[in-house]
Amino acid sequence: MNQTKFLLPESEIPTHWYNVVADMPNKPAPVLGPDGQPISPDALSAIFVDSLIEQEVSAERWIPIPEPVREIYRLWRPAPLFRAHRLEAELGTPARIYYKYEGVSPAGSHKLNSAIAQAYYNREAGIRRMTTETGAGQWGCSLALAGQMFGIDIRVFMVKVSYQQKPFRQIGRASCRERVSSPV
């Protein structure tokens, strides 16, 4: 019988994030501002803390993951990896197809991985309140939970139709200081 589910031990949670830019033969074009010119790190500082800007513009292959972030990741990571045997058979491919199931996170998606890191770096920079937008609610719920873990007040603006249709996103209600529906 072929193995389908693969579970790594907590000891194998990565210690560094991999930055794909380091290995790209053609580097991505710079992000452009409203004036059509590349945005400088100084311009990014209006909405990002310095440590996140440094990562955004870095060409280093490996970026260390702070231990407080790794400690929180241990609550649900490593996420299980599954082999898609039936999809392989349906496609008739000799390739092995795997997928990682991120639904084991408290927010139910991969978005909490980034939210935890962003909340951590903002707290380290002295930020005590953050505001974000969310469409269907997963990002807003993720940042709200991350903010709660790091003592940051979070205000979430949510698309009105999702706000009305997704009352089950209770984690946002429990961990977010303020949720605001868009007017349309």
For each predicted feature, which ranges?
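PLP-dependent amino-acid enzyme catalytic core
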Residues: 1-179
